[in-house]
Amino acid sequence: MIRNKIKNKKSKSDYYSEISLEEEEDKEEEIKDKKVLSKEEIKENENKNEKIKQTQCPEDNASLFSKITFGWITKLIVKAYIKKSLDIKDIFDVPNYLKSNYTSKFLTTEKQTFKRNTKYSLILNIYINFILLKNKKLILIQFLRVLFTLLSPLILKLFIEFTQRIDSEKSIIEGIIYCGLLFFSSFCSSLVDEYLVWFGMITSSQVKSCLTCLIFEKSLKLSNSAKVKYNAAKITNLISIDVDNFSNFFWSNSVEIFFQPFQLIFLLILLISEVGWSGFVGTAVILISFPINSYFGKKTSDYYEKLLKYTDKRVSTTSEFINGIRFIKMYAWESLFLKKIEKQRKQELKILLERGLFWLGQIIIINTNSTFVFVATMVTYSLSGNKMKLETAFTAMNILDSIRILLIVMPYCYYSIMELIPSNKRIEKFLSTLEIQQNLQTTKNSNTISINNGTFKWKDENFEETDDDDDHDDDDDEGEKEIEGKEEKEEINNFIFENINFKAPIGKLTMICSPVGSGKTSLINALIGEIEKVNGEINGVPENISFTSQQPFLLSTSLRENILFGKELDIEYYKQVLDACCLVSDLTQLSALDLTEIGEGGINLSGGQKQRVSLARALYSNSDFILMDEPLSAVDPEVANHLFEKCIQGMMKNKTRILVTHQIQFIPYADHIVIIKDGKIIQGTYKELKDENGIDFESIIKTKNSNLNLNKTIKDEEEKEDKEGEEKEEDKKEMILKLIKINYSDELKEKAKLLVEEDRNEGEVSFKTYKEYFYYGSSNLFLFITLLVFLIGLIVNRLSDFWLTIWTEQSFKEKSQTFYIICFVSIFIVSLILIFIRYSLVAKIGFKSSKKLHDLLINSISKSPIQFFDSNPSGRILNRFSNDISDIDTSMIDMFSDTLEYIFAIVVGIFSIIYINPMTIVPFLILSMFYYQIFNIYRVSVRELNRCKSISQSPIISFLSECCNGLSTIRAFKQQSRFIGIMNDNIDKNLKCEFASFAVEMWISIRLELLSSIIVFIVSLFSLFNGYSNSALSILSVSTARSITSYLKSACRQMVDLERKMNSFERVNNYIKLPSEGSGSGVKSMEFISEKDLLNWPEKGNIQFNNVQVNYNSNSVPSLKDITFSVESNEKIGIVGRTGAGKSTIANCLFRLVECSKGSILIDGIDIKTIDLNKLRGSLGIVPQEPWLFSGTIRSNIDPLNQYDDEMIWNYLEMVKLKKLIIEMPLKLNSKIHENGNTTLSYGQKQLLCLCRCLIKNPKLIIMDEATSSVDFQTAETIKSVINENLVNNTILTIAHRLDIIIDSDKIAVIDNSKLIEFENPKNLINSNSKFRKIVNFQTKIQTN
């Protein structure tokens, strides 16, 4: 390829020669062209520059003043205020220093070795790489913060001393200077605090971005056993919960935690210098509180670690429920899974409640500790015989106020690091799991791809031995735990192949055809390095590989993007690929041709269409080595032949191809054939295997054709018609291919959408929303009592300050010091009791709300129509159960209580100041108007940004979930870097919302700090010059004003944070209100028949379709058009037709997964719309096209309701030819199955287990949708005879492409282009000029060629 490119390039001398020869002739034309081009280019460049300017972060080009005041974010704030909403496209990009491709380089697995014997290596490395090396400003600002904390009480002392002077010694200028110093210290201290938050946010965002990237990159490298351990749900929890814990810690506590002890020591020295040795009493109280705080912190951390484990379990089961919802609905197993999730939720809530009790204890300690220090210090000071002086009391109170803030913050920092430790362990453990070792050796000029003496196993022994995870430590079912433990030990050395030799000639077709479960897929996975190689060598594997998995991996994007898979579009070659993969005619069934979104996992496509899209991707990649695992199993014979001729033997010719297939009619075309038997490989050419090994392929093919008897007299007449049909088909293809373009109209692009945009609430969070939240957790009376307790508690707190002024003034002259002390301590005790009551009430509301919301959410999701799951990615839905429920469980009620506390503290504080000095009411009213207006402007932008942030989180989870399901395909195509790039883009979109939100918070904080400092200045001026200058109350007003400044900022933040957390509630609440299935048009008006009247329904198994039409969504073309047919009791009906014709839709209609848009379906004369869905689905049986198993055991997958004894299960396992396999497993029926049977059973074995599940239930009416498509011919024949013998009294609809499976049916239904074109006895159809005859004729022609 490179050589050809070099040939086509012209040398520089040739190029310049050509120019000189043509220069004179074309000079004028070139000048004209250049002029035209230059105008177009200028316009295009202007547009590009404008676009870049709009998306570029305004901070990059902001002035110094704009950066200090965050004026650069004003434009976005105003835009949000005017629009009353924001979209993600309105938000500018994050600056380069926050982009994922930059931050992800800070920590890499190469730099960072996560060893289990190294404690907290992740935390340590983050400190080194993110703070010491990248954000040293944090340390400098923290120094300034300590300095201003120490200066504030000293300035206040000077101010108080000034007020104590006699009037003749006071100077107005000096007084104003002191007021100015109070303003300056207040504003500078607050400003330093804000910049500490800002740089902490930058560190936090970088840590979040980096860890998310690191976890995603690791997920793309997981070994197979690690994939079983860490499914998509667990990795989702790592990102949505554990990474968030890291982010929160490094935002607010990362540097503070080191400076706080020094800050506390300096403040204590100041206190002791002010009150003497009495300060040591306060110090002693602080020292005593540390071990108590430590105990509560450790217990909270332990419970949090347990909580995360139970959350993992619940989210994993919920993820399995969401991913398997189509099958769960068909089997009517919703209640089974809901009970399982409910049990796990109960365990989670139990831990949440126990953790809540310790949380209550630590909250009480945090809120009373500082007050207790103050009381102990001042009481000791008084009892020591010291007179309570005004300057001493209020300076000490100011110092103790700073200590109070520290004593509140320090435990939170400690608790946050204690909660960080479990997250640190979990992330480190994940990052230390074994990675896939794709140790393939490329040999130049090799003639074969080979395995020499290869030994392979699925299980990673090291992982099993070192993995002592606690997933089962807390299970109630000890028996299950014991079973799982035994199984792990037994299966550690479960080798798939031992000392095998394999070869595939370069540039040739190698076919692997063996019985079901023999190891065909395992051999393919060995060649691409997906299973562990213990011994031997793999040689000759090229660098560029294409791979089609047995269960196709498709992304929730357009059909085109799934085929291109990151490659550039070559429109002509692309059209050839569509034709070769027989996808051209399918495009007419899609609403927007190849631009149509096909949904998560290709939900919008049939099984055959999925396989062909996967095959088209492999072909389009133009790789040297193509591995295909059963790409022909779900397509009809005509399409299979087309794919083999045009694709596998056509466009793929001269490439190295390995094809796994049960389509044995193609065996004679193979250059090399591989048969796997009992773990050994027999290989050679068709002739070698026939002559040397005695394998009679011809007799197998002949047996397969024995039932397909054709009337020879009609055969010749059809050949002419076939040729005419082929010509028409080619003309039709040409017409469709002409419609395929590089770019499409906007109208068609709109039609292409399958996934709906995520719902988002607009405008402010209404009072009704808050009311709804509290409705779930309390009554109106209970809520009123809670609010009242909060208000009384804060009034009592303020009363303690008033009492201090009374004490210093000795207002009650006749009373002793003991009286003042007793009253002071009594106020403290009452305050303590009220704190306990108010937080107990709040905790109860939060717990009840959490429980009820989750229960309603999972019930609502379980009843939602299947179209909801088709149009919403699983990651988006799962985000409600992980991130949003986590917010409601752990954060919502904290925010609520803090917001209430700050609001009431501000109200009580302002009334206190106005009571002391009524003249302050005027400036307060003016400043309140400013505050209210600024807050309103800010609130809109930050609310909308947080909504955008929540919405932008879902694509991260959805994309992660998709990638976890397609790891082998991504790795085979070597697409890891592209997928990392896509994930980085998703992270950056989420991060830009977060960054803008933080910038907006800084914008308002700085402006509020200025307003707050102005309040301090005004109140201090009034206290000097209003006639109360010698009163303790005037000093109290200044002290109160100083405390209000911090409350104003905190209240503003907490109100917005609460509104942000309410966004999680809104999202959950919206899902709670989803419409239930069966409530669509034409259903509500019909009355349901009671279950009592349907006790033995269906008795006969008659089916009647009357003019049935089906549309999956409003944009789609009908999947079934005017279908009318009747099935009598016990009849066996075969349903055939081209892949994608609408066969599986018939099954979906019967189970009411999709409602008929027209017509009706009757079973035993009863319209199925009048039957309860659970009753309808529970009465029918199905073997789905895609086999689905849930995590559990063999037994629980066959009999989840525990209705049958072991003997019966073994009998049915023998029927489906699985008894031998399962009886050899160490725990037999109790052998563990992971989600969807991955690494435990082959695809064909999973199909047989699903068949067993259906047969043991023995329903009157059974639908078999390609039930044996992935099993070998002999097994299929055996099962066919078993069904014929045992299901004589059952009505069976069999959808199949393999005609030998359905040729003995009573009737054949032929579906073509969504219509029923034939419905007749197979013999009559074969002996007439029918479509079915042509299908049979075509298959026979292929197999006997």
From Swiss-Prot:
PROSITE patterns referenced in this protein's UniProt entry, alphabetically: ABC_TM1F (PS50929), ABC_TRANSPORTER_1 (PS00211), ABC_TRANSPORTER_2 (PS50893)
Sequence ranges of Acidic residues compositional bias: 462-481
Keyword annotations: ATP-binding, Coiled coil, Membrane, Nucleotide-binding, Repeat, Transmembrane, Transmembrane helix, Transport
Annotated ABC transmembrane type-1 domain residues: 135-419, 775-1060
Gene3D superfamilies tied to this protein: ABC transporter type 1, transmembrane domain, P-loop containing nucleotide triphosphate hydrolases
Binding residues annotated for ATP, in chain numbering: 1137-1144
One Gene Ontology cellular component annotation held by this UniProt entry: membrane
GO process annotations (BP): slug development involved in sorocarp development; transmembrane transport
Residue stretches making up the ABC transporter domain: 481-703, 1103-1338
Topology term for the membrane: Multi-pass membrane protein
Superkingdom to which the source organism belongs: Eukaryota
GO molecular function: ABC-type transporter activity; ATP binding; ATP hydrolysis activity; ATPase-coupled transmembrane transporter activity
Record SUPFAM superfamilies: ABC transporter transmembrane region (SSF90123), P-loop containing nucleoside triphosphate hydrolases (SSF52540)
Intracellular or extracellular location(s): Membrane
Keyword Membrane carried by entry: yes
Transmembrane segments: 139-159, 172-192, 246-266, 268-288, 356-376, 402-422, 776-796, 817-837, 906-926, 1008-1028
Record flagged with keyword Glycoprotein: no
InterPro entries: AAA+_ATPase, ABC1_TM_dom, ABC1_TM_sf, ABC_transporter-like_ATP-bd, ABC_transporter-like_CS, ABC_transporter_C-like, ABCC_6TM_D1, ABCC_6TM_D2
Family: Belongs to the ABC transporter superfamily. ABCC family. Conjugate transporter (TC 3.A.1.208) subfamily.
Protein name: ABC transporter C family member 9
Name of the coding gene: abcC9
